[in-house]
């Protein structure tokens, strides 16, 4: 299955893969029930395990490239939310879009408007549509206004 450039866990897993998994499970149950199933062992050499995505994984490192950070943010959306820090507190990032490069220090806020919060990165920028700094996700613009974060402001690495 092709993975698009804006996929998140929600769009890829819940909207695309989960329905296919349900179909495959129904087919497998029908094969077992009818005696047509042909079991085979999993090749352990090709098996892999992905543990839970926690804050150790979700912390954004501003030394990484814009492409790597964009992928991390999308991979942590909707949970737990990749994060940067503002005044030492995590700001989790959602609904992100990779933008062209800007000549600014990574973590610098370029602008914040109804379209989202734009943060400079190495080799690009990230437009963030929603954030979670306290309990609930909210539009990035509402958070930025409340936090006094605007153009010229700075977010720090999450790690």
What kind of region is each of these model predictions?
Residues 62-159:
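An anion-binding loop in the catalytic cleft
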Residues 1-99:
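Active-site-proximal loop/hinge segments within enzyme catalytic domains
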């Amino acid at each position: 299955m092709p993975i698009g450039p804006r996929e998140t866990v929600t769009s890829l897993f819940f909207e695309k893969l989960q329905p296919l998994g349900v179909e495959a499970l129904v087919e497998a149950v029908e094969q077992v029930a009818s005696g047509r199933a042909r079991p085979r062992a999993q090749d352990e050499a090709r098996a892999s395990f992905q543990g839970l995505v926690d804050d150790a994984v979700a912390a954004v490192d501003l030394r990484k490239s814009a492409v790597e950070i964009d992928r991390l943010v999308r991979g942590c959306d909707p949970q737990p939310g990749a994060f940067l820090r503002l005044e030492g507190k995590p700001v989790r990032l959602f609904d992100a879009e990779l933008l062209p490069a800007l000549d600014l220090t990574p973590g610098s806020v370029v602008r914040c408007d109804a379209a989202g919060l734009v943060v400079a990165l190495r080799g690009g920028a990230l437009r963030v549509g929603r954030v979670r700094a306290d309990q609930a996700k909210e539009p990035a613009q509402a958070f930025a206004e409340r936090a006094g974060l605007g153009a010229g402001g700075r977010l720090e690495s999450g790690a």
